[in-house]
């Protein structure tokens, strides 16, 4: 997980923590897909970090990604040491999802709740870029 947050370059990173079993997470996934398409070819990476259980990777996560034709980069976090990596994401995060972090070399924004719409996400990204 740490390498995702240690990038110091001219790229903007949009990192969303989600799971297939989290209804609010699934509801906001189209916003990240839209952002991924909108900024294709630009210096932006959209990374969807799944917190799905390891036992569900093949039966639920892989199938979900394929059925929903997710184009954003999907990573799986299997580290069960939650207290350690939650603090690395943001000290104010209690561990509930969905959560999004948008950062560049100069700025960082933590969104500790479900996004209302695509425009909210794009507004945060515009402020960070």
Where are these regions (language model features)?
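Thiol-/selenol-based redox modules, centered on thioredoxin-like
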Residues: 97-129
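Conserved redox-active cysteine motifs that mediate thiol-disulfide chemistry
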Residues: 17-34
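Loop/turn elements at helix/coil->beta-strand transitions in domains of secreted/extracellular proteins
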Residues: 8-13, 42-45, 70-73, 105
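Short, internal strand/loop/helix patches
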Residues: 64-97, 105
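Stable alpha-helical elements in mature extracytoplasmic
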Residues: 28-31, 57, 117, 124
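Structural microenvironment flanking redox-active thiols in thiol-disulfide oxidoreductases
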Residues: 31-68, 81-87
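Short pre-active-site segment immediately N-terminal to redox-active cysteine/selenocysteine motifs
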Residues: 11-13, 18-21, 53
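A short beta-strand-turn-helix
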Residues: 1-13, 36
